[in-house]
Amino acid sequence: MTVFQLDDFLAGWIGGASSVIVGHPLDTVKTRLQAGKGYKNTFHCVVTIYKKENVIGFFKGLSFPLASITLYNSMVFGFFSNTQRLISKYRYGDGRHPCSMLDLTVASMLTGLVSVGVGAPVDLVKIRLQMQTQPVLAENFNLAGNGSVPLRSMGIQSQSFYRGPLHCISTVLQNEGIQGLYRGAGAMILRDIPGYALYFIPYTLFCNWLNPDDNSSPPPCCIWLAGGLAGSISWVTATPSDVVKSRLQADAMHQRKYKGILHCIMQSYRTEGIHVFFRGATVNAIRGFPMCATMFLGYELSLQFFRSF
């Protein structure tokens, strides 16, 4: 058995595609709660989106995540699994040797660090597309100190600022440079390094607990439950840094409000209090379960299928 295996990347791609379709509507709600204004709670946000934008509002920006997050998850699962085998090969002389808790922690934290290279631009484009609503644009100007300037006078009507993912990428590159695509990457590192440790480790522990027989693969129901619980744990604990990341990435659609991570934290705390860093935690918990359950199930079943030949 070789250390590097390509099927982990292919299985991650399939798991990622299935999770995007399941999780995107609630991801839109989460982004609006964290980076937008005027929403009282999760239910009010859902109702407001439906009233103003219909069902299509929940699927804004779906095309880009469907194309890109599949690649992102392919990289995450492929890198994590191959890193596990590399660590086992180096420490125990056999890539199939079960990983210790330390091995899992190192592999998952390295995955979180590497994932930002692909994940930051993907997240930024997704969030910019999700945030395209008139109230959000107005809030951007208000917080930038231009509350008295009507949007209409700035040439901004109710239509979308970005025509699609490619137009969004080209606009960001023109206006903000390559660093614009990586705005919020620092906050994403703070989110994903511990976040992936609290993602893969609970999943492994839950799988072992639900299926104590080491000689057999966990049944689909165990994979689904373990993946869902791990996803909820990871996303809830990552909410504070996710709020900062979302605000930094949604920022500068027209004028910049935040100078960096610390400035964003201080400004958010000053204007909205400590509770702002837990905005969207309920949505993260609800969304994290089906999305991650579907992702792990798609990954594991695909991997079993590929390795059955």
Curated annotation (Swiss-Prot):
It comes from the Eukaryota. Keywords: Membrane, Mitochondrion, Mitochondrion inner membrane, Repeat, Transmembrane, Transmembrane helix, Transport. GO terms for molecular function: transmembrane transporter activity. It is found in: Mitochondrion inner membrane. It is a multi-pass membrane protein. Solcar repeats lie at residues 3-86, 99-209, 218-305. The chain crosses the membrane at residues 9-29, 61-81, 105-125, 186-206, 218-238, 281-299. Its main location: mitochondrion. InterPro entries: Mit_carrier (IPR002067), Mitochondrial_Carrier (IPR050567), Mitochondrial_sb/sol_carrier (IPR018108), Mt_carrier_dom_sf (IPR023395). One of its GO terms (cellular component) is mitochondrial inner membrane. Belongs to the mitochondrial carrier (TC 2.A.29) family. This is Solute carrier family 25 member 48. It comes from Danio rerio (Zebrafish). The lineage of its organism: Eukaryota, Metazoa, Chordata, Craniata, Vertebrata. The gene is slc25a48.
